[in-house]
A protein has these predicted regions:
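Hydrophobic/small/kink-forming positions within alpha-helical transmembrane segments
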Residues: 16, 20, 47, 75-79, ...
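A helix-boundary/kink motif common to multi-pass secondary transporters
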Residues: 30-31, 93-94, 120, 178-179
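Membrane-interface interhelical linkers
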Residues: 1-13, 19-33, 37-69, 82-92, ...
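Helix-coil boundary and interhelical linker segments in multi-pass alpha-helical membrane proteins
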Residues: 1-4, 54-65, 111-124, 172-179
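Hydrophobic transmembrane alpha-helices of multi-pass small-molecule transport proteins
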Residues: 46, 111-116, 122-141
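Alpha-helical transmembrane segments of compact multi-pass small-molecule transporters, enriched
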Residues: 40-45, 100-114, 129, 188-193
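Hydrophobic/aromatic residues within transmembrane alpha-helices
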Residues: 25, 34, 38, 88, ...
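Hydrophobic core positions of alpha-helical segments in small-molecule transporters
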Residues: 10, 37-38, 100-103, 122-126, ...
Length: 225
């Protein structure tokens, strides 16, 4: 009867735990290493899931339309959004960054209202205002002065914006397509972007060195699950 509510609670708990583990891993092996390693883990785990459910490791039945929008969603959400988010973990910590990320539904609804002609009820608008007020109260003091580094806060909001836009792009491309296959396509494009970035910055030696830190690799592996 309460399957939806229970599922939402489990997702929230998993999201919080993964943020804590990713913060720990980022402080040990760097945010770039964490990003690419956890995307590889996610790609493999989803591939195994597809192998069990659809007898194929990688989705080959997506249309060009779906590839375009899901790929773009992966670039914006899983590359740019997570690039900012994981960097913010190292500056303001995962707890504050996760709090900022709670604004993703608000940003998504607002963008949908302005650009996709989606309708927001009075109840939804009140919920948005309450959510934003809660975030401001949590990160500001009594004089409304921000208590956390501005750079970290901006990076966290950049991550939230990337996630929100990524969700909208994903919604446009997914239609009635299999969600697991769609997620793997998004991850593939995000992974490709990180590979290009790490290659351009010549950071592969640092990624290779990250595997020597067992504690860091353990943390990013647990967070990926």
């Amino acid at each position: 009867m309460f399957f939806g509510e229970i599922a939402a609670l489990v997702v929230a708990i998993c999201w919080t735990l993964s943020a804590l583990f990713f913060e720990k891993a980022g402080r040990k092996i760097g945010s770039l290493s964490v990003n690419i390693i956890r995307l590889v883990w996610a790609f493999v785990l989803l591939g195994i899931t597809l192998l069990i459910t659809k007898q194929t490791f990688f989705p080959t039945d997506a249309t060009g339309y779906q590839w375009f929008w899901l790929g773009l969603s992966g670039v914006v959400g899983l590359f740019l959004g997570d690039l900012f988010l994981f960097k913010s973990y190292l500056i303001i910590g995962s707890r504050t960054a996760t709090l900022v990320m709670s604004s993703v539904p608000v940003i998504t609804a607002t963008i949908g209202w302005f650009f996709l002609d989606e309708i927001l009820s009075l109840k939804s608008i009140i919920a948005i205002l309450v959510s934003l007020s809660g975030i401001v109260i949590a990160i500001a003091d009594r004089r409304l002065k921000i208590r956390v580094p501005a750079k970290g806060l901006l990076l966290a909001f950049g991550g939230a914006m990337g996630q929100a836009i990524g969700l909208i792009l994903s919604k446009k491309g997914i239609g009635d397509y299999d969600p697991i296959s769609a997620t793997q396509i998004r991850i593939l494009f995000g992974l490709i972007c990180f590979i290009i970035m790490i290659t351009a910055l010549r950071r592969w030696p640092k990624v290779k060195e990250a595997f020597k830190d067992r504690s860091g690799i353990r943390a990013v592996s647990i967070g990926s699950f």
